[in-house]
Amino acid sequence: MKSRPICSVIPPYILHRIIANGTDEQRHCAQQTLMHVQSLMVSHHPRPEPHEKLPAGQANRSIHDAEQQQQLPGKLVRAEGQPSNGDIAVDEAYSYLGVTYDFFWKIFQRNSLDAEGLPLAGTVHYGQDYQNAFWNGQQMVFGDGDGKIFNRFTIALDVVAHELTHGITENEAGLIYFRQSGALNESLSDVFGSMVKQYHLGQTTEQADWLIGAELLADGIHGMGLRSMSHPGTAYDDELLGIDPQPSHMNEYVNTREDNGGVHLNSGIPNRAFYLAAIALGGHSWEKAGRIWYDTLCDKTLPQNADFEIFARHTIQHAAKRFNHTVADIVQQSWETVGVEVRQEFL
């Protein structure tokens, strides 16, 4: 069965900063998480097992409790339609899996991650003070954080939607998780994660904060969130975490072997391109910009190793196809503003 690398929320560069600057306890916790993240990034888990095509329009959720262990999926504590068990992490995971499902169904008529009604499983309380959340190709997994650097990872709707979007990308574009195609993979998860949050809050592009993981940073950490889509590189400036290193323009592109070729770093460039397009097009982000990016994600001619220019070209073409050339020009200008030039002969 075909398999994909596992994608996690907290990038290695943040964990490295904690290891360098934290207390003994913080360093140990971050080291354990980093070792696990590194094993995840080279691990390949199989896709979910085949399932019956389920009725559209209704999520099929199951939430499990790992009870601070690392065995998956853990103890089933809430199935679809069951009431709360009083555990806030269980309730948040259950709710946000549902919100994400509803967004993709109501906006894009997509029946779960595989478009066939894939059941959505989540495991909470994974590991001891585990500083991450991840999609392993089959389910969502949430750590509790330590409460001093990171809060529980179920607290942020956009982070939940970010990880679930990796499942959609696996089923559609299958973007290789390395260098620019990997940064696009990460960016798509930020794009749709942000849109799910905006949709849930009823926000326009002007009202949105365009932050990823704003709720994750614990009190005392000097920052707004994990990433800023509007101004990459400005999300945090903290004694422990350092300064947000994301680039916002191709002239700042980071060439590195770390983090699968900088997938969490260089995603800032396409993130800002989407933000600029969404702001210029106005209204709700999912009405035009989001529709264009979704069409591109589902375009079978998009190569798995697409770089920024190839992806940009596809968004411009889909903007013209679904809307008009005025919209396409706005999308093209958004890419050019971040230094991604699309040669005219390819348009």
Curated annotation (Swiss-Prot):
GO terms for biological process: proteolysis. Residues 43-68 are annotated as: Disordered. One of its GO terms (cellular component) is extracellular region. Keywords: Calcium, Hydrolase, Metal-binding, Metalloprotease, Protease, Secreted, Signal, Zinc, Zymogen. Its EC number is 3.4.24.-. Zn(2+) binds at H162, H166, E186. The active site is at E163, H264. Its cofactor is Ca(2+); Zn(2+). It holds the Pfam family PLN_propep. This is Extracellular metalloprotease. It comes from Pectobacterium carotovorum subsp. carotovorum (Erwinia carotovora subsp. carotovora).
